[in-house]
């Protein structure tokens, strides 16, 4: 065995199970996280130094580490999908089952089971397929993701913001502001749309370019799925629903920023430094590209992007990939971004407003007979989430409009409940004067300690 690999196998973070407490509840999670982070830091260092054999050795060490396996099991049993079984209908819901699961996470003899195919409704009413792995396969993906993520984060495009630690949608929107707010900023935007990105990524490209255990990756890609008790093969794509899938998709699209930068470098024209102002901002498979003129976007950049995608088995949607002027505005990540003079204003898209109100009306309609307190709690959860996402935009008009539509929907809800009562009675029954607002939708309720309190509907504008 290679001496370097022997050295890695002696790493303290690869402690054997018989040296640790066999009780799940007594695992030292702080120590486990420190050990894994130490190995991940070494992977990052080796990747930056171009020592690819060292990277592989460290990845092997990490994926065979007890602590990493324990953290993988903890992740898949602690998140929201921890009670969602795969085709084997197995869940790990006891400390004993979780401890036994750690011992099952072995490379030798590993064969993933087919995914359980389900469909969820998208905002446009269409169905999105999800592939749900078994608990064991999820844990194996979480384990190998710990070894892959240090590499993916080191090599990622700097302006990629989706499915990455300590990055979010707001970072991508802020980057759009940074690019477009200056007086000499680019004025033309290519709004990119990839046809079924997750569903069509080339398996051959992934196997040739993703720096992880190829045998394990091939098994995941080719495991197939079960739908309506029938088995189907998977010949392309990385299924939405797998823990490692977002990282694989990100790594597939990484490199586009460099391809654009290499093609459109700053250069001198007639003794002056010239920049074509080509910038990329990407969140997962949603991206925009800026440029100083429409022709370059249409005739050069769009074909370049199409070729980049084609190499990876992907295609741009001709209908949805459009070029717009920043003064006319463009939609990105649920925001409409538009330049007014020197100011960049962001607000919720009309599509987002419509979808939100459809959701609100659905909740109200489905709860015609529930108590006011219960309805307020359900609505507040949705209002808080939607309002929180858009709180930093130029949302005053949008929020006023939404508040008014919610009021109208609730007024109809109240009228249906008391069809024989007058408007004044209905108003006094459900709306109250609170902090100077006479039309506050509110309900009194009793706390566990017996004291009375008042629950009010959240307002986006207050």
Locate each region found by the language model.
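Right-hand nucleic-acid polymerase module
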Residues: 1-2, 344, 362-424
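Intrinsically disordered, low-complexity and often Lys/Arg-enriched segments
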Residues: 1-30, 34, 269-272, 451-462
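Charged boundary/loop elements
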Residues: 21-81, 146-162
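Phosphate/adenylate-binding "loop-and-lid" substructures adjacent to NTP/NAD/dNTP-binding pockets
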Residues: 55-127
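Conserved polymerase palm-domain catalytic core
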Residues: 104, 108, 155-159, 164, ...
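A conserved non-catalytic segment of reverse transcriptases
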Residues: 312-374, 382-385
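Extended C-terminal regions of large enzymes
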Residues: 406-409, 414-462
């Amino acid at each position: 065995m290679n001496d370097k690999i022997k050295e890695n196998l002696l790493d303290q973070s690869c402690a054997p199970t018989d040296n640790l407490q066999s009780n799940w509840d007594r695992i030292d999670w702080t120590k486990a996280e420190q050990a894994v982070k130490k190995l991940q830091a070494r992977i990052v260092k080796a990747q930056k130094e171009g020592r690819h054999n060292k990277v592989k050795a460290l990845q092997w060490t990490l994926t065979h580490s007890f602590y990493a396996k324990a953290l993988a099991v903890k992740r898949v049993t602690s998140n929201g999908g921890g009670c969602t079984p795969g085709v084997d209908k197995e869940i790990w819901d006891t400390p004993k089952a979780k401890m036994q699961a750690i011992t099952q996470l072995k490379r030798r003899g590993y064969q993933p089971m087919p995914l359980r195919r389900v469909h969820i409704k998208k905002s446009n009413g269409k169905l999105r397929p999800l592939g749900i792995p078994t608990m064991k396969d999820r844990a194996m993906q979480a384990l190998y993701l710990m070894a892959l993520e240090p590499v993916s984060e080191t090599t990622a495009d700097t302006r990629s913001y989706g499915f990455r630690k300590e990055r979010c949608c707001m970072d991508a929107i802020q980057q759009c502001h940074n690019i477009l707010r200056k007086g000499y900023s680019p004025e033309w935007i290519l709004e990119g749309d990839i046809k079924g990105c997750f569903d069509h990524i080339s398996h051959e490209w992934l196997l040739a370019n993703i720096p992880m255990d190829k045998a394990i990756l091939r098994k995941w890609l080719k495991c197939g799925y079960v739908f309506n008790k029938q088995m189907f093969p998977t010949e392309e794509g990385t299924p939405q629903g797998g823990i490692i899938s977002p990282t694989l998709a990100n790594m597939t699209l990484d490199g586009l920023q460099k391809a654009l930068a290499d093609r459109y470098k700053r250069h001198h024209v007639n003794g002056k430094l010239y920049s074509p102002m080509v910038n990329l901002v990407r969140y997962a498979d949603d991206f925009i590209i800026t440029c100083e003129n429409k022709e370059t976007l249409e005739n050069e950049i769009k074909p370049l992007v199409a070729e980049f995608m084609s190499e990876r088995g992907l295609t741009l949607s001709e209908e949805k990939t459009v070029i717009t002027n920043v003064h006319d505005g463009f939609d990105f990540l649920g925001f409409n971004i538009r330049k007014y003079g020197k100011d960049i204003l962001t607000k919720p898209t009309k599509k987002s407003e419509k979808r939100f109100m459809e959701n609100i009306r659905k909740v109200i309609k489905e709860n015609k007979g529930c108590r006011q307190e219960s309805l307020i709690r359900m609505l507040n959860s949705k209002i808080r989430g939607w309002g929180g996402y858009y709180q930093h935009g130029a949302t005053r008009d949008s929020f006023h409009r939404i508040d008014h539509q919610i009021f109208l929907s609730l007024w109809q809800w109240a009228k249906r409940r008391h069809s024989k009562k007058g408007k004044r009675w209905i108003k006094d029954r459900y709306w109250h004067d609170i902090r100077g607002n006479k039309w506050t939708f509110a309900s009194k309720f009793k706390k566990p300690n017996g004291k009375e309190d008042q629950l009010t509907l959240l307002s986006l504008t207050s």
